[in-house]
């Protein structure tokens, strides 16, 4: 807009070519709207406007009307003010949104803080209950440890006095009467016929032509070849036959290690045997067959037990493992 206003002024101030001679008479008289003579437009070498033309009417009108330029400036100022107001409103809207976001975050933080406070209160209550429970348990443990210590002290005193050992042994026997009475490892019969059978077996071994003989018999328990009849008593078999029937018992006995002469360990522990009917050992007392023994079987004490050691033969040992009170005194000394 300023370029449009300045361009007529520049065009009015442009230099015109120099005109020789006086052209005031040649030009027709023209009157300006303001009443001035047209001679003022003539160019003379002696006039003040030598070489310059008079300002054009457009330039005069522009230069003499400051109200139009002022109105244009006012319009520009109004547009800038409107733009500034719009920017301020946008800035205020952004600030309002940021404030709302900050307020929402503040409320969220307050809710989280309230939840954390509730959890802390619950944990404090739980810790208080746990402390009470721990103190109660500690008190009970202290009481139990005191009682146990007192019981151990009393037991040590009784052990030092060597009292109640026989009672303890009797109580142990009473706790497992079924295993000792109902489930024996074997049924032993002491008989004097054992010596005669042993001599006969030694003679048969010396005269036998077969070098190898199986230690066990066949699995047929109804008619075993090595079964013998013995009399349970202190006299010989011939004398037992002459006595009445109620003076002694006639039994069918077998040698140690034969079929069904010992109780099956697997059956005794679990009540079942993987071999079933083919097992060489007895599955119960009803299947046990008596074994003939030496007359002095289990009459002398085992030297390993008397020395305080463990006998490696176990229940198969031919010597006695139970000690009498006199033997216990000898063992302690």
Curated annotation (Swiss-Prot):
UniProt entry tagged with the keyword Metal-binding? yes
Biased composition (Basic and acidic residues) is annotated at: 232-241
GO terms for molecular function, please?
A: DNA binding; mRNA binding; zinc ion binding
Cross-referenced SMART domains, in alphabetical order?
ZnF_C3H1
Give the source's domain of life in one word: Eukaryota
| Coiled-coil parts of chain | 110-138
Q: Where is this region: Disordered?
A: 198-249
Annotated keywords: Coiled coil, DNA-binding, Metal-binding, Repeat, Zinc, Zinc-finger
- Bias type Low complexity, positions: 199-210, 217-227
| The UniProt record lists the keyword Chaperone | no
Q: Where do the zinc-finger regions (C3H1-type) map?
A: 258-286, 296-324
Q: Which InterPro entries match?
A: ZFP36-like, Znf_CCCH, Znf_CCCH_sf
User: What protein name does the entry list?
Assistant: Zinc finger CCCH domain-containing protein 9
